[in-house]
Structures are given as structure tokens and as C-alpha cells.
Amino acid sequence: ESLNISLLDGRYNKKGEEKADQYKVSLAEPNAEYDFIILSVAGGKIKDAITTLSQNHITGSLILFCNFWNSREEIDEIVGAYPYVIGFPTAGGKLVGNELDCVLFDHIMLESEEKAGISNYKALTALLASADLKMEIPHDMVEWIWLHMAINAGVTSSAAREGKIEHPAQLALNLMKDAHALSTTVKVIRETIQVVKARGVDLGFYKNELLPYRIPATFAGILMKRMFKTNELTRRIMTLHSDVGDMLYGCKCVYETGKLKHLELPIFYSNIEVLGSIWESSPL
């Protein structure tokens, strides 16, 4: 079996280069041993993936490329005996049948060697460099993922503010061309990042990530509209991100923690509560 790949490649050009290729899928055999196993699954499914690997006695250093709302201790427990490192791909796409439409930026988020639980970290960084991928190492990868999820929850809930999320690509297009809606999204993100702060995260370590949401919301909305219009990489990844279950998982994690910690997040809560029955049946 093979995948037909359409890739907007952002490694060598800020505008991205359109590429096409075919990837032959070779399924892993039981008892196989690998240097690295990239684990990239939808929210809440890490445990099931680890179980599948373990039952088939497939071994190797895990690279976690997933959204999760767990603590590091919980991830340790879920992963069990597997050595692992936490990262995050600045990439995304949509798989329909055997057609993969995707976007790749020029870097990968990766945990520092000190915090990584693998013995072949240097081999991993060499592998990434050989693929012309830079590495960005945040203060703490777990906290960075929480922050990323909170920001995404702000964006998703704003895009779906009219209670419809069945056609996420169209919602993304509508949001990206509406400066007023984008300025409201910035206000929602300011609310959702308070949930991460309430979990004990020092936001001072993530100033670069949060800078776009510090400037006046009206101005930020205008800037974001212009950025989406001119930056095809960012625009494409927004429209390709279409896993509704994964989007709602992130929203639900942020919403429930906000309620648990009695935080005042009026716009975010209002956006979420409009989703109604779709929201009630979403995974967590």
C-alpha cells in the first residue's frame, strides 16, 4: 500500500515549495526493533498506542508528537518501560483515503537532552539535521504543549462560535479573513492561557509564544488577517487541520480545567456552550 503525498515544504523557502511524492507503507512486524518510533495520535489515545506497541513487542525510543493534557508524571506512567522524548511537529495535514495533503515548516519542537529519557538523543538531533529540520527547545515541553492546546482551544472555539464545527476548513477560512473575529479570538486566547497559568506554569518562560496576544486585540486582529493572507504555510495548515474529535478534545481539557479552578473565562465558556450536543459527545 502507498500514500500519494502533496506537501507544501517550508524548509527552504518562507513561502513554501509545492512537492509531490509517493510513500510506500511498510507495516511493522511483531518483535521489530527500531531506533525511533514516532508516536503521533489524536488526543487521549497515547495509552492505546502504547498498548498496541507493547502487545506486539515492538521496541525503540519513542518520540511523542501528540497533544496531551497530562502531567509529566502521568505520561511517565502511560509510557511505562519505553524510553521516550517529548517533541511536537510544526507540521500538519489531512489524510483522505490514501491521499495525504500536508504542510511542513522548517523546525521541530523538542525537549532538551537533560529532560529527555532516551540514550540516543544525539542520533535523533543528527537525524533531524540530515532532513534539514531545525530544532527549537522550549523551557519545558510538557508546559509548551499545554500552552499550544490552550491557544488552539481559543482559536477552535472562536471559529465554531456559531455552534457549527462540521466543516472546519470553511470555518478556518471564514475566521482568517475577518479581522474583527480574529481580534475576538485574541481575547479568547488571553482567557485560555490563564488556565495554563492556573496549573502552575510560569508564562514568563514563553514570552515569544505569547507575544502576538499581548498587543491590543484590534491591532492584533488586523495583523493576523494580513498574515493569513500573505503566509501560505500558516494559511494552509489552518485549513488542513480537520480532526474535529481532536479539536474538541483540546477544548474540553481547557474548559473542564477552567471550571475546576473556578476561572472567569466568559467569552471562551460562551463559545463552548453554544456547541451543545456536538460538545457533549466529544471525547476526553
Give a label for each model feature.
Residues 41, 180, 242-245:
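Short, surface-exposed alpha-helical recognition segments that flank or form part
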